Each structure stands twice: as structure tokens, then as C-alpha cells.
From Swiss-Prot:
Physiological role: Effector proteins function to alter host cell physiology and promote bacterial survival in host tissues. This protease possesses deubiquitinating and deneddylating activities.
Organism: Chlamydia trachomatis serovar B (strain Jali20/OT)
Pfam families (alphabetical): Peptidase_C48
Locations listed in the record: Secreted; Host cell; Membrane
UniProt EC number: 3.4.22.-
An example molecular function term from Gene Ontology annotations: cysteine-type deubiquitinase activity
Name under which the protein is recorded: Deubiquitinase and deneddylase Dub2
Amino acid sequence: MEPIHNPPPQTCSYSRPSTTYTSFKDASCGTKVTRIIIALFLIVISCGLILCAYTFRDLLDADYSAQEGPQQATKLLQQLDKVLTGPPLPIWDNEHLFQFSCLMQNKHRRVLPIDICNPLTKFNFLEYICNCLMTKQSVNVNETDMCELFCPPTCTPENYRRLLCTSSVFPFVMWHDPSADTQEAMLTKMDQTMSSGRVGNSHWVLVIVDIEHRCVTFFDSFYNYIASPQQMREQLEGLAASLGAIYPKEGGSDSDQEELLSPFQVRIGSTVKVQSPGEFTCGAWCCQFLAWYLENPDFDLEEKVPTNPSERRALLADFISTTEQAMSRYSSLSWPTTD
């Protein structure tokens, strides 16, 4: 009997697959395509992360240039030379607007300084102006207690009450950014603009309520930045009707109630663009308009402002230079007194 030889048990051996790295030049066509796609994908992701690191305001303020033909580029440079002659004009913000209104109050006495602690926008200016004029009316007839009187933080209630009693011209400034479509969004945009230190798309416009002349005047240095003149007139006519009820006509017949409560007149003060492109001078133009109004409420803006851009710029530059030093006395933002 022959011995049985059992075969040795088979064992499974697992070997680690070897990875061979090949250069792009020696790689197969499919590998090359795969590597190119991966590289492009990583580049796109990297660019997206870089763009996310920028704020929206940084993108708006970035400089972009387009290649124009020689003739178009020459015409553009000629237009810019007409406008941007001389050093850049300073930017007047809410503090400058307040200081200038204090200067006008000191000169004309009938002007109430601008309250910059309550930001006005196109969403709340109608209600705010009505409340301010109603407060003046109640103060005049001693219906408002000193404790109930709201006054700016840099003015005492007693002084604010006296200023209200002696004022008949009420200037209000509105801040606007076209990208904001609600009051909350507008205030958020305002905070972002102040924090960034950039003007961006922000803009100041002016509303003047004159009780003696029973008139509401609107001024926009860009003419139609917030809305068209007709749209602004429609909004202001509602305000004018409310003011007519708050301040009835003096000397009218008691029997003619409609005549007594006739609305204030509405005037659109800007029929042309007076602010040049590339300049941030809306605040200074609001102050210049207010100064002209206080000299003559019936003045014609087109007669005051030159049509030539360089002459118009020189006019505003002269106004700023002759006014800034006098305004500096109110740099502490304290309200003027009636003493």
C-alpha cells in the first residue's frame, strides 16, 4: 500500500498593489484629460473663495477699465478734464450738514438746525417731518410738557424748546442708497457705509419746510436719484396737505374751512443735474441750496448754477472754502443757543 501524500495547504497571500506615478508627459491621454479637469476645478474653487473674501462694497469700489477706441478714449478724457480740474472737493457728511445748519441758524435765526441723530430715508421722512412740525405747534401753544419733549442728545430740552418756538424754516436731509428696499435695509446700509469709510452709492437730498411761505421744497443734486420729479411731487403733496392741516392759514374766514386748511405749495428745486459725475458733493450742494434759499426762497437754481462743469465746480469749491472755517465752531456737535 502506497503512502498517501497530501498536498501542502494553500495559503492566500495579499500583496499591496504598486502605485506608479508617471509624469504628465508620459501619462496616457485619458490620464492627461483627468488631470486637466481636476486642475481647472481647483482653480475655479480657489477663485470663488477669494471672491467670497471680498465684501460687496469692495467689489463696487474696485477699478475696472475697458478698452475703447482712440476717438472714444480721447473724448472721455476731454470730458473728465473739464470736470476734474483742481484738487478733489471734500465730502460733506451728516456732521458737516449739521454744522452748516447751525451756521445758518446763527445768521438767520429762523432756521432749526438739522437733527442728525434721527436718520431720515424715503421710508420714514413724511411721518418724521409731520411729527416735528406738530411738536412745534404744541410747543407754541404750551401743550407739550418738558418731560415729553424729545430733543437731540447734544441739546438741552429748554434750548430745543426755544429753538422750536423761534424757527419757521425746517431743513431735513434724507440719506439714500438705491440697493435698499426697506427702512431696515436702508439703516443697515448706512451703518455699513459709515464703517467702510466709502461713499459707494449713498446720496444726500434736502427737504425744506417753510411755515411762513407755506412751502415744501425738495432738492436733489442728481435731480432724480431717489425717484422721478413727478413721483417726488406726489409724495410731497401728501406731506403738504398734512402740513396745511397742522398750520391753517392766518386771517382766513372761519366759514371757509377748505381755504383755512389749504395745503402747502410743493416746489421741486432741482430741474437739472448740478453734481458732476465722479464727485461726491451731494452734501455740499444741499448746503449751498439751503444758503441760496435763505437769501431768497423764490430763487431759480438754473440762474445760480453755471452750465459749464468747470465753472460749476469752481463755484462749489469757493462756497466750501469760505464756509468750512466758520462751520468749525460747531465741530463739537452742540446745538446753538438762542441767548
